[in-house]
């Protein structure tokens, strides 16, 4: 593009065309959604203590990256996409392109870090606080920004595409010969001839043959050309009677310095007239993404494809873990309420657990296993080491599955029964069972080979209880016969029952919360792929086949990727109850406070007017009139008392 075409470009812009203004308004509306939504996310986390978690640190970082996209990228991108003219200068063009890649890459890498955080939370819930601590989360966030900067940095130091610059050189009859040269966008005022050697680009030869009118050799002077036997120079011929290019020929130089063309155009004898006095760079009204193939592949892999595959891997593992745990909960954990039978003293509630007995592990090992019980003891609560050592079980060399049913009385009947217990009896306080326990072995027959013990701390407060499966059937049957004899403190037994139920339900509730959070973030990742995958596909195709990508389609897909920055806060509002509540509270603080005050004042005024009208209406009953008169008198008395006179 020559200087004349560049000047005509800025003059041809229709700034006030209705279609352009409507398009600009739509793009700016998207920008407002990006800024407003991500500001809400940041404010919600900082204003709500409930939302201050490690996972939400990554969400805030994601919102910061999206907010910077809305502030530093989208306003300028909207102007460029609508008018196709860059009016902000070449320096800001370079900075804008780098910031665009930086912020978008940081947003994508934040989604990758969130998927890693959810994977650890779902698959390792017990060790999650130590694995993903606040310090480690902050270090990971810092690494995200550094890695994103390394992806956007190369164009700032010269890794850019070669922009074509066309300059006329020679008039020849009805044709004008010119060189199609290239200039690196990192260089100002220097041109390199577009030489093609064999099948790749060749640099200027160190000692090119001299061609021209006797002047000193200058490789950037259009009057000279470094030509050898294997080099080719592309020369275009433009018909002076037409505004379009009529022919493009290839001039091949031999070692005898003779030049022949298909159109018999003698380059050596052409008079060097109308040469441009200055060689200008690229048009300042253009600011586009680079088409350098190497950088396109480098940035596309680092910004999108590698993070996308990492996220898909983590969520596939999360899905598998969620399916396994949900199946275990549905099959091995069930709570039902039974009806009160005739003559029974308990309103039973049945708690069904599923236990796996593994090989070569004792009870102490089971306490350190994460969710996989490798011994014959299932712990409800946190038993003390003394109790664990006292009731430690022997190692087993087989593997079977046991279904255990724990029947415990209601809190009312336990309190009623506790009044008849002997608190001071040490043997009953430490050894008697509180619940009746039965379990089914692998043969399907029900057995009574189990016993539920309870542990009691000082002051009669029970801390935990655990279930032990043993072999002594006669002794166990004898102990179970004493189940109805409840000893100990009346407050410890309901506490034992509630503690065991609370621990199990808390674990299940925590898992379901983690699974729900993972589902919400999976939707975020799905929207991320939907928004960015089409653009990065076209982004890779364009350097290899520029005619294959329609410019309008490329712009639409580019802004579809930008829309991902506006979609994330909407997903939080739709699927997260905590974020939704925080959003409502922030919005009401900003917009509803004045309206509520005016509404209250209007209500007070309407109530007073209604009282006055009711007191003056003659059609009401005498009692109502007396009541209204009393209200009016009280109102008048209150007004008189409030009168400063």
Swiss-Prot record:
Glycosylation positions in this chain: 2, 174
InterPro entries, per the entry: GPCR_Rhodpsn, GPCR_Rhodpsn_7TM
Superkingdom classification of source: Eukaryota
Topological relation to the membrane, as annotated: Multi-pass membrane protein
Stretches in topological domain Extracellular: 1-25, 78-94, 160-295, 542-551
PROSITE patterns noted in UniProt: G_PROTEIN_RECEP_F1_1 (PS00237), G_PROTEIN_RECEP_F1_2 (PS50262)
Chief place where the protein resides: membrane
Compositionally biased intervals (Low complexity): 369-385
Expression (tissue specificity): Highly enriched in mushroom body neuropil and in the ellipsoid body (at protein level). Expressed in oviduct epithelium (at protein level). Expressed in the adult and larval brain, thoracic and abdominal ganglia, terminal cells of the larval tracheal system, muscle, mature eggs and reproductive system.
GO CC, one annotated term: membrane
UniProt xrefs under Pfam families: 7tm_1
Loss of function: phenotype: Viable with no gross anatomical defects and females display normal courtship and copulation but are impaired in ovulation. Many mature eggs are retained in the ovaries with mutant females laying significantly fewer eggs and taking much longer to ovulate an egg. Increased sleep with longer sleep bouts during the night and a greater number of sleep bouts during the day. Severely impaired learning in appetitive olfactory conditioning which tests the capacity to learn and remember the odor associated with a sugar reward.
Positions of region (Disordered): 190-212, 358-386, 479-500, 621-645
GO molecular function, one term: octopamine receptor activity
Disulfide bonding pattern of the chain: 93-287
Keyword Protein transport: no
Record topology, Cytoplasmic segments: 47-56, 116-138, 317-520, 573-645
Location in the cell: Cell membrane
Family: Belongs to the G-protein coupled receptor 1 family.
Protein name: Octopamine receptor Oamb
Organismal lineage: Eukaryota, Metazoa, Ecdysozoa, Arthropoda, Hexapoda
Gene: Oamb
